[in-house]
Swiss-Prot record:
Phosphorylated by host PKC and by an unknown kinase. Residues 140-157 have a biased composition (Basic and acidic residues). The modification Phosphoserine is found at S64, S162, S210, S271. Non catalytic polymerase cofactor and regulatory protein that plays a role in viral transcription and replication. Stabilizes the RNA polymerase L to the N-RNA template and binds the soluble protein N, preventing it from encapsidating non-genomic RNA. Also inhibits host IFN-alpha and IFN-beta signaling by binding and retaining phosphorylated STAT1 in the cytoplasm or by inhibiting the DNA binding of STAT1 in the nucleus. Might be involved, through interaction with host dynein, in intracellular microtubule-dependent virus transport of incoming virus from the synapse toward the cell body. GO terms for molecular function: RNA-directed RNA polymerase activity. Residues 158-169 have a biased composition (Polar residues). Keywords: Chaperone, Cytoplasmic inwards viral transport, Host cytoplasm, Host nucleus, Host-virus interaction, Inhibition of host innate immune response by virus, Inhibition of host interferon signaling pathway by virus, Inhibition of host STAT1 by virus, Inhibition of host STAT2 by virus, Inhibition of host TBK1 by virus, Inhibition of host TLR pathway by virus, Interferon antiviral system evasion, Microtubular inwards viral transport, Phosphoprotein, Viral immunoevasion, Viral RNA replication, Virion, Virus entry into host cell. This is Phosphoprotein. Residues 133-176 are annotated as: Disordered. It comes from Rabies virus (strain HEP-Flury) (RABV). The lineage of its organism: Viruses, Riboviria, Orthornavirae, Negarnaviricota, Haploviricotina. A motif (Nuclear localization signal) lies at residues 211-214. A motif (Nuclear export signal) lies at residues 49-58.
Length: 297
C-alpha cells in the first residue's frame, strides 16, 4: 500500500490560510451586525398606539395652521443651517477641507496618481484661502514684528526634528537585534520627509493591504503574511516604513517601493507572532535583496 507524504510547509501554509479566512469571516460578520444595528429595535405597531391618538382628526383650519407651522419650521431650519456673518470662518474652512478629503479619496479609487491629485488640490486650497482669508489692512507692520519670532521657532523645530532623526527607530533596533547584516545602512536616503512622500507610501501600501507575501519560517519552510495581520493604523505603518532605507527616495520619485521588505520591517518591530514565526537571518537577506533590486532600477 503506497504512502502519501505531505510537506509540513504545505500544512502550515494551509493553516495560515484557514486562520486568515476565519478572521475575514469574523470581520464580515461584524460589518453585517453594524450595518443592521438600526434593525434591532422593536417596531412600532399601529394597534399598540394609545386610544386617544386614534381619535385625532384635523379640521381645515387646523390644516392651515399646520402648514404655517411647517413653513416656520423650515425657515428656522434654514437659519440654523446657514452660518451668520459674525460666526468663525474657520468652521467653513474645516467643512471645505472635509469635502476636499472626500474628493481625493474618490479620485484615488478611480486610479489617478496621488502626486497629481495633491498638486491640483494644493492649488485649489491656496486659491480658497486667498479669496476667503484676505490680509486685513495694517497687517504688514505686525507681520514684520513677528518674523524674527517665527524664524526662532523654526530653528527650534528643526533642531528637535534632527535630534529625533538621530535616535534609532524601534524597527531599526529590532532589525539589528535580529542579526541584520551590517551592509544595510539603516539611516541612509531617508532625508526627504514631506507629506507627498508619506501619501505615496500610504497609497502603495493601501493598494496591497490584503496581499499575501511569502516569508521564511523557523521550520525551514515558508508562511504567508500581509499588512492586515499587523492590526496597525495605516499612519503608524507609514511612519515605520519611512525608516526603511531608500523607501522615501523611491516614493518621492513616484517609483514602486519594496512592499515585502517594508512589511517584514514593520512586522519584525511590532508583531510578536511574526517574530516567533520568521527566520531572522533569511529575512534579513531577503530584505537586502529586495532593497538592492528596487533601488537599482
Amino acid at each position: 500500500m503506497s504512502k502519501i507524504f505531505v510537506n509540513p510547509s504545505a500544512i502550515r501554509a494551509g493553516l495560515a490560510d484557514l486562520e486568515m479566512a476565519e478572521e475575514t469571516v469574523d470581520l464580515i460578520n461584524r460589518n453585517i451586525e453594524d450595518n443592521q444595528a438600526h434593525l434591532q429595535g422593536e417596531p412600532i405597531e399601529v394597534d399598540n398606539l394609545p386610544e386617544d391618538m386614534r381619535q385625532f382628526h384635523l379640521d381645515d383650519e387646523k390644516l392651515s395652521n399646520l402648514g404655517e407651522m411647517v413653513r416656520v419650521g423650515e425657515g428656522k431650519y434654514r437659519e440654523d443651517f446657514q452660518m451668520n456673518e459674525g460666526e468663525d470662518p474657520n468652521l467653513l474652512f474645516q467643512s471645505y477641507l472635509d469635502n476636499v478629503g472626500v474628493q481625493i479619496v474618490r479620485q484615488m479609487r478611480s486610479g489617478e496618481r496621488f502626486l497629481k491629485i495633491w498638486s491640483q488640490t494644493v492649488e485649489e486650497i491656496i486659491s480658497y484661502v486667498s479669496v476667503n482669508f484676505p490680509n486685513p489692512p495694517g497687517r504688514s507692520s505686525e507681520d514684520k514684528s513677528t518674523q524674527t519670532t517665527g524664524r526662532e521657532l523654526k530653528k527650534e523645530t528643526t533642531s528637535i526634528l534632527s535630534q529625533r532623526e538621530s535616535q534609532p527607530s524601534k524597527a531599526g533596533m529590532v532589525a539589528q537585534v535580529a542579526s541584520g547584516p551590517p551592509s544595510l545602512e539603516w539611516s541612509a536616503t531617508n532625508g526627504e520627509d514631506d507629506l507627498s512622500v508619506e501619501a505615496e507610501i500610504a497609497h502603495q501600501i493601501a493598494e496591497s493591504f490584503s496581499k499575501k507575501y511569502k516569508f521564511p519560517s523557523r521550520s525551514s519552510g515558508i508562511f504567508l503574511y500581509n499588512f492586515e495581520q499587523l492590526e496597525m493604523n495605516l499612519d503608524d505603518i507609514v511612519k515605520e516604513a519611512k525608516n526603511v532605507p531608500g523607501v522615501t527616495r523611491l516614493a518621492h520619485d513616484g517609483s514602486k517601493i519594496p512592499l515585502r521588505c517594508v512589511l517584514g520591517w514593520v512586522a519584525l518591530a511590532n508583531s510578536k507572532k511574526f517574530q516567533l514565526l520568521v527566520e531572522a537571518d533569511k529575512l534579513s537577506k531577503i530584505m537586502q535583496d529586495d532593497l538592492d533590486r528596487y533601488t537599482s532600477c
